[in-house]
Amino acid sequence: MRTVIGRWLLALLAIAPAACETVPDYPNRPLTAGAANPPPSDLIGADPVAPLILIAFSGGGSRAAALGLGVLDELAAQTYPATGKPVSLIDRVKVVSSVSGGSVVAAWFGLVGPARLDELKSDFLARDNMATLEWDAADPVTLARLSLSSYTRIDALRDLLDRELFHGARFADLRRPGAPLVVMNATDMESGEVFAFTPQRFDDLCSDLDQLPLSVAVAASAAFPVALSPMSLRNYSYEECKGAIPGGGWISAELTLPLPRYINLEEYKRARYANALRNGKDAYRNEHYLHLLDNQGVQSLTEVLVSPHSPGRILDAVNSGRARRIVVIAVNARADADNGVGGNPAAPGLLKVVNTVIGAPIDSTTARTNASLQDLVDTLKSAGASTVRAPGQPLFAGLRVYNISVDFDQFLPEQHQLQIAVKNIGTSWSLSPTQLQEAVEAGRILLRQHPCFQRLLLDLNARPVLAEPATIRKSCPFEDDKIS
């Protein structure tokens, strides 16, 4: 039986004509000069103690999508009493940040909502998508397109996603009532910056996000270096808008005032990047075209939490007292399969090298960015214990941040067999029926048994919880526990 990476390599070799540089057919369209993309609707709601759930889905192909689906399934199964009727936790998911395989489940959830989540299995995850890519790559029509036109390897993945799952859906279709803000992420090859598919970022490009197919963002998010070519977008700010783009006041303030770069360097860097994309004054680089590759979605979730200019405006809600319970769920589909390299005295062959190039950076970067998110959440939790607010500073008093990680290393000893099984699922777009069932079940189990998820259920008076209340409070403590 061919290995997972052997299948990647077969597809690579089959579409080798695409290895040369091509001028792509850009999938994004311009805005009318002076126009802006519609901002996200209000995410917070009227009840400050209702949980505000933010999720980051990591990469890992279909393994990551199935794990994320399991997490959403568990949220859908849990309800808590509220005024009038029980509320499902999945209805409190307000922001989903994603990358690679995680973007498949993020985009699907944003598009169809909780009721049709399970269709992701039959429409995509249960299918041998690697075989489809192989057949598409070997098709004479595809080969002709690859060699004679701007069609590239990433377009083959985009077409697969659109044909099998999204069926022409665009970002405008995500703006349904009650839908979460979905932030799919990639990396800008020119600058190395995170490129998030948000209304603000597409304002920077003078480009219409509503008209962009969802398959473009998912494919860009999943563009593994080497295995897939980048997804390319055109920056219309240089011609159609000529630098005249609304909504840039915060950028000007960050770049011209002397203190912002010392107070919040990351926010200053974000402003600098946005200014460059907008063809603004004294831009540090000119990017007429963007070429996007795989990235890590946790970084954008961090920005949503701390940036006063992020699309979700979570910090504003905290500052105004409109959000007192924030739930951060970082779903890490990092694999840990033994590839046999360390036990073999011979130098690894081409298959092993390509496997490492594709898989290892995804897994290691996921671990690093999750650690950064952990530091941020710890800081917010500490601030939540404060009862004093300086003038102009966020009101953190009484804020509870439930920090929940879903990671294959968190299985209990009695769940060892399931742990080994899911850790050995390769990074590809195909799962066996057993692998699909195991990955979804892993997501449900790992979320359900996390101490801070149990603490959330306890604080919401939801049932059932898996341990005595005192044990749960001890496992996921808050500073105000000492007071109450």
State what each model feature region is.
Residues I5, C20-S484:
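Catalytic domains of lipid- and phosphate-ester/thioester hydrolases
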Residues M1-L9:
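Bacterial N-terminal signal peptides that target proteins for export
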Residues L10-A14, A470:
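Processing junctions and N-termini across compartments
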